[in-house]
Amino acid sequence: MAFIKFNKSELVNIAYSLKREILCANKTGAYCNTSILTCNTRRYHGLLAVTLDRFGGDRYLLLSGVDESLVVKGKQFNLGIHCYGDIYEPRGHKYIVDFSADPVPQITYKVGEMLFRKSILLAQDRDQVLVKYELLSSPAPAKLVLKPFLAFRNTHSLTYQNPDANTKGNAIQGGMAFRMYANFPDLNLQVSDSKAKFIEEPYWNNNITYSDEYRRGFDCREDLLVPGWFECSLKEGGSVVFSASLSQEETAGLKRRFTSGVKAIGEITGYRDQLRRCADSLITDHNGRKKISAGLTWMYTGLLRETLVSLAGLSLYGLDSPKMFEEILDNLIADQQERLFRRTTQVEAPLYMACTLQDYIDYGADEKAVWKKYGVIMRGIIESYLPG
């Protein structure tokens, strides 16, 4: 039985289901975040947002989403859903009959006599999201159409149709590579079906509305580029895996990578296990430097006060790792010299260092060893307040 599950009556109720979200984060600083209907309601929502060093280490949303359609006997069923002002179109949520999230988000659709499932996996050690599509049952073969929606923007911003965007892609193994603007990395979109084809007919999907932003009174509309679409053939019992990645992948191995990725995550065993997983998801290891994300998906990584307040709870009592505690703390000290010892707008933030070190000692660390390593840091912090 799935640990997290929603039924059809809950899922087709937009007022209910749009407030429930999928949130996956990995060690590279990437995330996948959307509603359980895969209808984005906030500017931060999307299938793949990544941390880019070339832009100061901020997160950038590259792939906003993918709209799926099933074509059977010449009839097309659109499974996607977007908000345009007060209108939702297409209304693919009406086909959803089940949602579970153990160990990865799975959405099941029933279209006539067809049963179709979508599973989403964010790779844990690379900037890649994998989506597996399975035709569980069907009276006839089906064509699967996948339309990617590209953003290529900072997660805090919105984007609009403009003449500077490069709407063309380059053919790669099993798909296409897109780079909408200079200095961005390529976004490689590929599918595991060797016979699939990509129809390159770019157009802008305008005035997509993010309902949560609208409710808060923020800018809430943007335009997203649809560069074309994939067409794949599916038979009953068949599957295809879609990959969006900063690296070009071997498409023959996409199904194996998805299967091994799901296996590595494992099933959720209870609330404590789920809490530990959430704690671990807040700790990034981008470029081999561990830091704490202050909050997914809109807050930053490696903030002074937020790291000091949460460090002991996450690394010691959550993950039982003194080594991780010291590694994150050492990285914080190296990165926050100015705010620790000279100038900060959060006047109390450096003083949390004392609380954090005391938490470490209470956990079981040797107090003399802690003072030997971090005593000079505490002295420096206290002395920084002397000038007033």
Where are these regions (language model features)?
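Active-site acid/base region of carbohydrate-active enzymes
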Residues: E267-A279, I361-G388
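Terminal accessory carbohydrate-recognition/targeting modules of carbohydrate-active enzymes
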Residues: M1-E267, R305, L316-D320, I333-A334, ...
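Alpha-helical support elements that line or immediately flank enzyme active sites
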Residues: W298-L332
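Glycine- and aromatic-rich loop/turn segments at beta-sheet edges
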Residues: I107, D280-M299, I333-R343, L386-G388
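An acidic-aromatic substrate-binding cleft motif
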Residues: T251-Y300
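Aromatic- and histidine-enriched alpha-helix N-cap/loop-to-helix transition segments
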Residues: D125-Q128, C232-L234, W298-V309, T344-C355, ...
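Short glycine/serine- and small hydrophobic-enriched flexible loop segments
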Residues: A312-L316, C355-A365
